[in-house]
From Swiss-Prot:
Motif stretch (PP1-binding motif): 62-65
This protein's encoding gene: PPP1R3B
Organism: Homo sapiens (Human)
UniProt-listed Pfam families: CBM_21
Protein's name according to its UniProt entry: Protein phosphatase 1 regulatory subunit 3B
CC per GO annotation: glycogen granule; protein phosphatase type 1 complex
Lineage summary: Eukaryota, Metazoa, Chordata, Craniata, Vertebrata
Record keyword Signal present: no
Modified positions (Phosphoserine) in chain numbering: 261
Amino acid sequence: MMAVDIEYRYNCMAPSLRQERFAFKISPKPSKPLRPCIQLSSKNEASGMVAPAVQEKKVKKRVSFADNQGLALTMVKVFSEFDDPLDMPFNITELLDNIVSLTTAESESFVLDFSQPSADYLDFRNRLQADHVCLENCVLKDKAIAGTVKVQNLAFEKTVKIRMTFDTWKSYTDFPCQYVKDTYAGSDRDTFSFDISLPEKIQSYERMEFAVYYECNGQTYWDSNRGKNYRIIRAELKSTQGMTKPHSGPDLGISFDQFGSPRCSYGLFPEWPSYLGYEKLGPYY
């Protein structure tokens, strides 16, 4: 078909048919040009950078337990004893026993609560001259108390004993002293020694005290530390001595401690200087 024939047929059509058939080919001219939905800045375009992609929505976290996955909630491990013992640098049990024993030893340690009589020689000599007997020195070692006693040589036959209580004079025991040969012959003084073991268990509320007595020619002479006795107290109580004043009641020949127990000495908690112990034991002269 030639172009002339097409043009002829188009011209022969009615005007209404021509507009209806080819109406879709006529479109209105837009008033404004369309803009792109994404625009790059001039800086990004110049540098060649690409705009970042849109961030995806975060996935919400979920918590799931082991039992939901078919697993156990607990894990049990069983340890069996080794066939060969471990080579430890020290024995833990022995170390703990040592710590406990040290703590117990500190709480049960005792100290002398009086000064050494022979430390003041002039006073010691005057006491010996007046009372004919006097404790010379004393020391505490390994749950035992040991010391020496000086007496005037009034006769050949003589007896020296330590009267000691471990329960605040509810009961007492007499321990004989042993004669010590004097270095210098012909002295008018004799020396006796004693060594007394302390009980394993002593109640904390009880007091240990002792006095010295000397029997000669049917007479008995006492050294009771001027009526106060020689006391042995626990180490932790040493710092608290002197807090209680001595008893100021009438002199009836007997006194009572703070628990109401009778004692053969006078006064309560007098102030005495402390003594840690002598390394050597022996006569003063």
